[in-house]
């Protein structure tokens, strides 16, 4: 790999490490999302603890965190495997942020941003899948897991050369939701509309 790839991996991780949920909550005077709600510093939990505009800001910033490094990678005409590593680094930064004691979010919005930069069509299909599952069952976590499991097939259909890198990112997302999966299995996960 070239020095450009290594630099973009570091940049992606550091950008991913900027926890917008914590920053937006501090600016809006909301409680720390790591200590309230689901204890997850992400857009869904910020919405859950009462900050609609902050949640939107978090969502957009987290999407940008994944999308920008991947767009730069495409600009440098890197290989799909290298672009996949950069996308993975952004997600790892969000999940294990250097600047916030490695206590991060689930990485869904950041992964979506990266995938959006790789394939708009596949990302649109993934978003539709997420929405359908959410509207049917009301679980954000279930929507994320099912979408992550299906997304590699969408990518294979539209851009097969990115199937393996995207599958790695999706595996990370599923792993990050292991606690949610256990609660879903036990019937202990509450739907979004049941939470205050």
From Swiss-Prot:
Q: Do the record's keywords include Lipid metabolism?
A: yes
Q: Name one GO biological process term.
A: phospholipid biosynthetic process
Q: In which pathway does it act?
A: Lipid metabolism; phospholipid metabolism
**Keywords associated with the record:** Cell inner membrane, Cell membrane, Lipid biosynthesis, Lipid metabolism, Membrane, Phospholipid biosynthesis, Phospholipid metabolism, Transferase, Transmembrane, Transmembrane helix
> What is the membrane topology here?
Multi-pass membrane protein
Which is one GO molecular function term here? acyl-phosphate glycerol-3-phosphate acyltransferase activity
Q: Which GO terms describe its cellular component?
A: plasma membrane
Q: Where in the cell is it found?
A: Cell inner membrane
List the NCBIfam families hit by this protein, alphabetically: glycerol-3-phosphate 1-O-acyltransferase PlsY
Q: Which family does it belong to?
A: Belongs to the PlsY family.
Write the protein's name. Answer: Glycerol-3-phosphate acyltransferase
């Amino acid at each position: 790999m070239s020095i450009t790839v290594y630099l973009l991996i570091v940049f992606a991780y550091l950008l991913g490490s900027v926890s917008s949920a914590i920053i937006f909550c501090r600016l809006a005077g909301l409680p720390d999302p790591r200590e309230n709600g689901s204890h997850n510093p992400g857009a869904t939990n910020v919405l859950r603890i009462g900050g609609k505009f902050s949640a939107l800001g978090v969502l957009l910033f987290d999407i940008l965190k994944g999308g920008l490094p991947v767009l730069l990678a495409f600009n440098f005409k890197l290989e799909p495997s290298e672009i996949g590593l950069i996308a993975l680094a952004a997600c790892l930064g969000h999940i294990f942020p250097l600047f916030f004691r490695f206590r991060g979010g689930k990485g869904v919005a950041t992964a979506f941003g990266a995938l959006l930069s790789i394939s708009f069509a596949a990302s649109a299909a993934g978003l539709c899948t997420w929405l359908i599952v959410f509207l049917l069952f009301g679980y954000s976590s279930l929507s994320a897991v099912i979408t992550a499991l299906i997304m590699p097939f969408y990518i294979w259909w539209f851009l097969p050369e990115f199937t393996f890198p995207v599958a790695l990112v999706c595996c990370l997302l599923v792993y990050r939701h292991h606690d949610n999966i256990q609660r879903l299995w036990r019937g202990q996960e509450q739907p979004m509309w049941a939470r205050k």
